[in-house]
């Protein structure tokens, strides 16, 4: 895992803003399973990568995005053997390999239990040493948005930073 730099923080913050502000991001996810939402997230993240490479003055930013962005189940791409922990291997939902090795996890939850599962997976990605950073996107399905509100608590804030 790399230490955070201003450039890496900016990249991940801009990725987050791009995702959550996208009109393509479904706000009501209760009728969809995680796999369906992940399918909808792909073009949003891909678009961010294209824009990133455009800002870097790449000659062909779309080919850069195709080369450095992967998703779980994508055949023939990023097939490196993952580090095993607790007798299994953990694969992120999405992977960005340039400018940083970033594992991306997506979870939707009406309770904290699924959130904890996503954070546990994120921890495994981090401890496995393959990724520089992990971005975990959580959509709060609870009635009163208690998961989002809990992020302001000291313990939760320490965990997600």
What residue ranges belong to the model's regions?
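Interdomain/boundary linker segments immediately adjacent to catalytic/signaling cores
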Residues: 1-54
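Active-site metal-binding core of divalent-cation-utilizing nuclease and nuclease-like domains
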Residues: 28-40, 46, 55-100, 112-114
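Conserved beta3 VAIK motif of the Hanks protein kinase fold
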Residues: 104
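Conserved protein-kinase N-lobe ATP-binding Lys motif
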Residues: 108
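Nucleic-acid nuclease catalytic cores
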Residues: 111-116, 126-161
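Charged helix-capping and loop-helix junction motifs
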Residues: 117-121
